[in-house]
């Protein structure tokens, strides 16, 4: 007898007042609105067919193109090196980087919402701000969401460029006065010192890359270092985490 149950999908969309919109995707690419500009970028997970005709895709202000080992953005005249946009009532500096990234991951918004809810519930219950550690903090989306909700946040990244970018985003979002510690360091090295100090955190946020700079000439490789990272993270987690 055939199973008549229909497979249900859960699709999340951002509020229309936000500056981001996924316009179309397919054939290994995605077309996105980032504030005032439309970007076309590769996305290997977009295995389906595009819905828009090529004319729609041709309206992109910048397109990330790979030719062999070379990759670069093809930009229309007067395309800016930087602009700002709103996302989840936070403000971000957007740039087209050499790795096709823009400085934010809009798909993380649902997690920011969940984090804020957890933090606000904890504050309502215990009348005390939880302490959150954000490792591989990048440009600070999760850091800003947690700080806005009332948490004390320690933001760690091995890239000075990312740290500076995150701090500018905090300024743009009006959160410069929030209790955020900005730490330029390798995640594992930082955790080892925190373990020795006996420091504890009520929540940990981690979005490690597969491969990256770990500072001081070291290299991060997720297949080699992730298990150690999790072990260290467990040691700094408080007895009453969020």
Q: What does each of the following model-derived ranges do?
A:
Residues 139-153:
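Conserved SAM-binding loop of SAM-dependent methyltransferases across substrates and taxa
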